[in-house]
């Protein structure tokens, strides 16, 4: 928890126990016509803090112009993750940032704007029940991310389940459940279930 979150919980006399139930990751998507499909963590930091504003600064072959960063919502968990975990608690200061209302609109924006880079949850890469999902989008590319700078094909990973599990993909988020049940009753039983094999298969789906 952040200090402000802890203070808020204490003020409400709500002191939950937290435990992890799943892992998620941020996926970076670009227009299919964009030749740049590799980014390092440093590249992402430089884009967010305004040091890198043009695609040609990342790849001289890239003539797509100014980089436009697109989020699903200005107050979303994606924005918070970038600011807290990628920028070390500092705000995003890139002036070319666009925020839409939902993930499907991020995908549509990237489809229509070759200069854009969209940031979404990787669950949108795998949910085949949703026809707005990236599985069905042939004019979108999912970028590979590298912890090492500069990024190379050998050092970069896409947000696939295996690379999230072994920690090779850089932008991983832990999903926590919070319990405030001193009697350790039904909520704790559910917690143990969701952490078990059957519960984890449900989470995976």
Language-model region placement:
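Exported/periplasmic ABC-transporter solute-binding proteins
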Residues: 2-3, 7-24, 29-205
């Amino acid at each position: 928890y952040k200090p402000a979150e802890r203070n808020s919980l204490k003020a409400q006399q709500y002191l939950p126990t937290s435990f992890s139930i799943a892992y998620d990751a941020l996926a970076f998507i670009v227009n299919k016509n964009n030749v740049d499909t590799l980014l390092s963590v440093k590249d992402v930091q430089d884009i967010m803090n305004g040091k890198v504003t043009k695609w040609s600064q990342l790849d001289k072959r890239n003539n797509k112009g100014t980089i436009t960063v697109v989020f699903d919502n200005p107050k979303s968990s994606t924005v918070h993750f970038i600011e807290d975990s990628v920028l070390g608690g500092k705000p995003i200061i890139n002036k070319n940032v666009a925020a839409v209302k939902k993930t499907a609109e991020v995908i549509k924006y990237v489809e229509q704007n070759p200069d854009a880079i969209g940031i979404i949850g990787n669950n949108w890469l795998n949910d085949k029940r949703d026809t707005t999902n990236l599985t069905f989008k042939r004019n979108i590319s999912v970028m590979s991310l590298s912890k090492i700078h500069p990024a190379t094909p050998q050092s970069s990973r896409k947000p696939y389940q295996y690379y999230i599990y072994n920690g090779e993909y850089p932008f991983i988020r832990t999903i926590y459940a919070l319990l405030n049940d001193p009697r350790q009753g039904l909520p704790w039983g559910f917690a143990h279930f969701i952490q078990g094999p059957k519960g984890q298969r449900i989470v995976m789906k």
